[in-house]
């Protein structure tokens, strides 16, 4: 997750001279260096185009761009993609400078800060709770009768249905990268994590057909 910080440059210009000492970004301080503790996140499966493909061994879901470490807190790279259904999650690591994906072997474990994990319940659709019934409007006594009610333009146009999104999943960026396929496209299986290509959610939720 990346945030763009608009530094509002160009507004100060000439003002900056007389108001010296105000520079720098100030405010938030971001954590530098490794975290205080790390937990197991994934096991190495194979390398692909310079990235590491892992099988998750954690019950939680990692943040995108979260830093991945070895057990001794040496940086390996960042989480790039999340793939597969919720009960069998895979993810890829974009290697840091100087780290080679081919240098690892099957079963090698990778670690993550516990602060960079989300509970899987965050991605499971919650059942809708029925609210209290709406009170009926009372007709005003006397006066001119209503205009007959126009029917609301065809009953809310038939409920277009979403754009094929993965209900409760990330709809990640994986897909046809020579080995990542097969875990579902954008809008793949319900509650899963999509790939980086694939059909866009079943041609966008039934957009075609004849127009009348």
UniProtKB/Swiss-Prot annotation:
Residues 8-27 are annotated as: RGG-box 1. The keyword Nucleus applies. Keywords: Nucleus, Repeat, Ribonucleoprotein, Ribosome biogenesis, RNA-binding, rRNA processing. GO terms for biological process: snoRNA guided rRNA pseudouridine synthesis; snRNA pseudouridine synthesis. It is found in: Nucleus, Nucleolus. Residues 1-32, 124-212 are annotated as: Disordered. One of its GO terms (molecular function) is box H/ACA snoRNA binding. InterPro entries: Gar1/Naf1_Cbf5-bd_sf, H/ACA_rnp_Gar1/Naf1, Transl_B-barrel_sf. Residues 145-209 are annotated as: RGG-box 2. It holds the Pfam family Gar1. It comes from the Eukaryota. Non-catalytic component of the H/ACA small nucleolar ribonucleoprotein (H/ACA snoRNP), which catalyzes pseudouridylation of rRNA and is required for ribosome biogenesis. This involves the isomerization of uridine such that the ribose is subsequently attached to C5, instead of the normal N1. Pseudouridine ('psi') residues may serve to stabilize the conformation of rRNAs. The H/ACA snoRNP complex also mediates pseudouridylation of other types of RNAs. The H/ACA snoRNP complex mediates pseudouridylation at position 93 in U2 snRNA. This is H/ACA ribonucleoprotein complex subunit GAR1.
